[in-house]
Amino acid sequence: NIAGLFGGNHRTRNFGSSCEFADYRDYIAGDDITKIDWNAFARFEKLYLKLFLDERQMHTRIYIDASRSMDYGKGRKAEQALRIAALIAYVSVCDMDKVSVYAIHGGTVEEVFVGVHGKDMYLEQIGKLNDIVFDGDSRISEALLPASVGYGDGLSVIISDFLTDDNYEDAIDYLCSKRRDVFCVQVLTRDELNPKIRGKSHLFDSENIKKTYRRNIDKQIIEAYRKAVEYVTSRIRNY
């Protein structure tokens, strides 16, 4: 039941061979006699086996929204997303865990690097993040539902602006059904949270350049926009 060939620093609810005591159980013929608690035997005149917490190498899987809307704004959301992914990946390898990074393009998941462990391998592979092209749209649920996401072996991280009509909650539920911890990071720019544009404006959909809008941006539109942003942020925050 070992999740990897290398021991990790994450303690699981499974019993294993670490040094941290977890519980007792009755001795059964064939058990490792070195794990018998002889002090307990002297007290209760019954054989008990010491159980220890299993330390496993977990697998962190990071999914980056590579849609064109992420390549927007001062400081670019894409750059922030890559920094966050690099940081989480580094923390994972420092915990002696494996890490894989994927880019979500449209309704597909594309490998950036897979199964990286150790700082040396991390330094060799992390530059591949710069090869991600942010273009088109992303449909998180469509991409993740058919993907191999692992089972009960670590953390799944989704990094996105979540500016989508996609029912991404289905993807979160799917990951949870695979007994994975799920962490969502929403990346938005200050302009998206508090737009400064006013007056007559020509707007376009960054993920579909055929969709354009001409609007006179007034206080009412800004107020409606802010309510929409609050819905988008609260939707992922409260799920």
Over which residues does each language-model region extend?
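Exposed, interaction-prone extracellular/peripheral surfaces
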Residues: 1-10, 26-31, 40, 49-83, ...
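A positional/architectural concept
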Residues: 15-17
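N-terminal juxtadomain amphipathic helix
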Residues: 33-35
